[in-house]
């Protein structure tokens, strides 16, 4: 309910452009030493409660995970903010298609799209919803900079958090032998992330280059055209939006997106 009030406040300040993603907690329960509990049920209940609250409705909820008694934000006005459910797997996607305005995928890669979009279609049909009314957003890393090597170094540094570098994320881009090297050296990627270094010890540069290409948008301005083609492929598959994760020097990154990337997408 605090999320609901916060995003409603943002929505009012932003003239109806507010939005929020509610997920199952990601890595945070593990970091905090907490049990993940009923992630799908809890996330679905949270999304449903927030949806009611941001519309100014009375929230009376007696769920398996959350409970509320007669909560109401009487001050909200205008078009409600967009409420996404963060989801990648089939159960979370089913929940998202039931309760949310849309879903945000995390680091979705092209080889995953056919199966994932199948889950979306199944969920929408199951819950009697139209695809045109459901937003599909892919969260992806944007590292494009004026200096190509700086961009690639940053992308290598952040690689461990691309799907937490689990096998389904890296195996499609590597040979079995290369995938085995990555699987045996995940700690090197974590060390690079923690020390803010682009040096992945024990992993050949050519393997790192394949991962950067497959799991992020990196390079300089000359690389934008091929990244645009990838984004268009996502769009053709049904993705309606992309959330670009910025890193170092976000001001310059925003300028690159506005002045260089968006004109290419139009």
Enumerate the language-model features and the residues they cover.
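Glycine-rich anion/phosphate-binding loops
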Residues: 1-9
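Alpha-helix N-cap and loop-to-helix initiation/capping positions
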Residues: 2, 34-42, 108, 154, ...
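Structural motif
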Residues: 13, 98-99, 237-238
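Hydrophobic faces of well-ordered beta-strands that scaffold small-molecule active sites
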Residues: 18-22, 83-86, 103-105, 134-141, ...
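An alpha-helical appendage that flanks or caps ligand/catalytic pockets
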Residues: 37-72, 113-236
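Alpha-helix-loop-beta-strand connector modules within alpha/beta enzyme cores
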Residues: 46-49, 53, 257-266
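Loop-centered beta-sheet repeat module
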Residues: 78-124
């Amino acid at each position: 309910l605090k999320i609901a009030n916060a995003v409603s406040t943002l929505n009012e300040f932003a003239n109806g452009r507010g939005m929020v993603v509610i997920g199952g907690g990601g890595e945070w329960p593990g970091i905090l030493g907490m049990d993940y509990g009923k992630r799908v049920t809890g996330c679905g209940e949270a999304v449903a409660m927030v949806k009611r609250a941001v519309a100014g409705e009375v929230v009376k909820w007696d769920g398996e995970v959350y409970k509320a008694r007669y909560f109401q934000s009487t001050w909200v006005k205008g078009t409600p903010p967009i409420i996404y459910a963060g989801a990648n797997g089939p159960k979370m996607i089913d929940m998202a298609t039931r309760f949310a305005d849309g879903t945000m995928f995390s680091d979705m890669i092209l080889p995953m799209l056919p199966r994932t979009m199948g889950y979306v279609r199944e969920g929408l049909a199951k819950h009697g919803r139209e695809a045109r009314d459901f937003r599909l957003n892919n969260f992806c890393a944007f590292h494009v900079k004026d200096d190509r090597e700086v961009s690639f170094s940053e992308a290598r540094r952040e690689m461990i958090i691309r799907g937490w570098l689990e096998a389904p994320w890296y195996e499609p881009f590597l040979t079995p032998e290369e995938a085995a090297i990555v699987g045996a050296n995940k700690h090197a990627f974590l060390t690079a992330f923690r020390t803010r270094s682009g040096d992945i010890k024990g992993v050949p540069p050519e393997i790192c280059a394949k991962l950067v290409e497959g799991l992020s948008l990196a390079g300089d301005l000359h690389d934008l055209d091929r990244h645009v083609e990838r984004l268009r492929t996502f769009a053709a598959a049904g993705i309606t939006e992309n959330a670009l994760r910025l890193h170092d020097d976000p001001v310059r990154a925003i300028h690159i997106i506005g002045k260089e990337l968006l004109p290419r997408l139009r």
